[in-house]
Design a protein with these regions (language model features):
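Conserved beta-ketoacyl condensing-enzyme motif
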Residues: 1, 92-110, 120, 174-175
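Conserved beta-strand-centric core segments of catalytic alpha/beta enzyme folds
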Residues: 1-51, 139-193
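Acidic-glycine-rich active-site phosphate/pyrophosphate-binding loop
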Residues: 6-22, 110-127
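Beta-strand segments within the central parallel beta-sheet cores of soluble alpha/beta enzyme folds
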Residues: 53-60, 93-100, 125-131, 160-167, ...
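Short glycine/threonine-rich loop-to-helix capping motif typified by GTGT followed
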Residues: 68-75, 104-120, 139-144
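Extended C-terminal subregions enriched in glycine
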Residues: 131-140
Length: 193
């Protein structure tokens, strides 16, 4: 009740009561639609590639000065910096998809999307998020997004958001995963098999 009360007071929590209440990546929404989920996740990182199910080939992180702890700049400078760092020397066209943070808020979804458009221009990778299905799980959301990326790579199956239609579908080789925390702390991870 406390966390829901806080999010409601900030006016970021969804007031919809249906199965798809979190409408992340729905750029036509007129109200915030963030919904909480609950999850736990763990992973094992190793410098050795033996028995690895995936490889992290790039890591990026950045922060930005914000006017409040829940805000983000209109072009998500923190995401621009973290994505550029994670992509590194890879060609932009080699990034097949992005699992976006996309919390379901008008500002959060739009600013991250703007950052993606600034980095990739007219050649956007396929975009998705898992929050329409599992809600925002706070600290676990980044790991769940990483898990989604790995599952899509392993199965060569892109899991699309019902609210955003991608124009192309291609073989999945490299997927970028974005996450951001309150206060403008962004992380991007490039993953491949």
């Amino acid at each position: 009740p406390f966390t829901l009360g806080q999010l409601s007071a900030l006016k970021v929590y969804s007031t919809e009561e249906n199965a798809l209440a979190d409408r992340c990546l729905d750029f036509s929404k007129t109200s915030n639609t963030m919904v909480l989920g609950e999850a736990a996740a763990c992973l094992s990182l190793s410098l050795l590639s033996e028995n690895a199910i995936a490889k992290i080939s790039g890591i990026g992180f950045a922060t930005e000065v914000l006017s409040s702890g829940t805000s983000i700049s209109s072009d998500a400078k923190c995401f621009q910096k973290s994505m550029k760092m994670a992509i590194g020397s890879n060609k932009l066209e080699d990034i097949d998809a992005i699992v976006m943070h996309a919390p379901g808020t008008i500002q959060g979804d739009a600013t991250e999307y703007e950052a993606v458009k600034i980095i990739f221009g007219n050649n956007l990778p396929m975009l998705t998020s898992n929050k329409w299905k599992v809600g925002h799980t706070f600290a676990t959301s980044g790991l769940l997004s990483l898990e989604l990326a790995i599952l899509m790579l392993q199965n060569q199956y892109f899991i699309e958001s019902p609210f955003y239609k991608n124009s192309t579908c291609k073989k999945l080789k490299k997927i970028l995963v974005n996450a951001v925390g309150f206060g403008g702390n962004a992380v991007s991870i490039l993953v491949e098999l």
